[in-house]
From Swiss-Prot:
The gene is murA. It comes from the Bacteria. This is UDP-N-acetylglucosamine 1-carboxyvinyltransferase. It is found in: Cytoplasm. GO terms for molecular function: UDP-N-acetylglucosamine 1-carboxyvinyltransferase activity. It comes from Campylobacter hominis (strain ATCC BAA-381 / DSM 21671 / CCUG 45161 / LMG 19568 / NCTC 13146 / CH001A).
Amino acid sequence: MDFLQINGGAKLNGKVKISGAKNAALPLIAMSILAGNDIKISNVPNVADIKTLAQLLRNLGASAEFLNENSLKINTNDINSTKATYDIVRKMRASILVLGPLLARFGHCEVSLPGGCAIGARPIDLHLSALEKMGAEIDIKDGYVVCKGKLKGATISFDKITVTGTENIVMAAALAEGKTKIINAAKEPEVVQLCEMINKSGVKIEGIGTDDLTIYGSGGKLLKFSDFSVIPDRIEAGTYLCAGAITKSKITITNANPNHLVSVLAKFNDMGFNFEINDDEITIIPPKTIKPTEIITSEYPGFPTDMQAQFMALACVADGVSVIDERLFENRFMHVSELSRMGADIKLNGHIATINGTHLNAADVMATDLRASSALVLAALVAKGTSRVHRIYHLDRGYENLELKLRNLGADIQRASE
């Protein structure tokens, strides 16, 4: 199994190009099930989760061909199965995104209950109750969600904001008969891009970018999509800014969208960092002393839960006491025990972490999920000595060429096998 070996203490400098957003690409790939034409998607990140979803489509009978490392051509005209099997779904929670489009197009589907990162319960009940309101009959049988029914427009009010739930229902509503209204919809940039692409395909969507969406379904008519490019990954962008921050290095990220990073940049400002922003480039300028901060995770446009672990690593070396309140997911502090192995001073009380800034020392640590693994890499960049980060298959699910990009910035980092 691969691990990363990192010698801490190197200063970083230079530029790093941000990849396309994994969390935007996944629903856009699932959206191809709604299409009656070939779709070409560019700026697709070359990460494991994307390859998994492309393979899932192939298993259904679609063609999904990588034209190069970051471009994907999909045709779903020859889908001959509507069963997404456990062997592929178990690798990735986002596989549930095929549920809405498969049901809307074919009137039946079976999707294995999802896998992926082990972060709390993350139930899919919200997806299922919404589809039932649209006319679906749903059973959970032998570990599969079994759905059938012709979907009709309905008013869906989510009790809790759900990103994948919003995406699933938007896609289902696109082919449903009549008007669907989604109240308390997610507003993330990844949801916005999905809505924009469907809107351009001829299905009218009102309220894009708000928490109140109205979708006028095509009544089963397949959609025609233009070629498009995936938006930049705001979480990857934030992670590389954290790499510059934790090593007190001036670095520049390119191909980023500063408008998607407002809450993250504000927290960096609180901690004493400044920025130069020029179109799609952001340069982070470190202070002499990193100030502590207080963070509460929330839905977009609030501070993203997917940046919580990285900022915890940064808080570990701040001058003072920081507090992080994780409001969105349970069990999302699994990196704490590993950071503690490196000398971090962190106390947990339920969903609140209190971090007393200190110096970090190298250690062997183990990744438990995607964002936790990036936090351990960040900590290792500044820890004294040589660290090894194990179970980095979590990293490969969501970060494209992480060690190569960090090495190009000057980090002393190598991938090796044990």
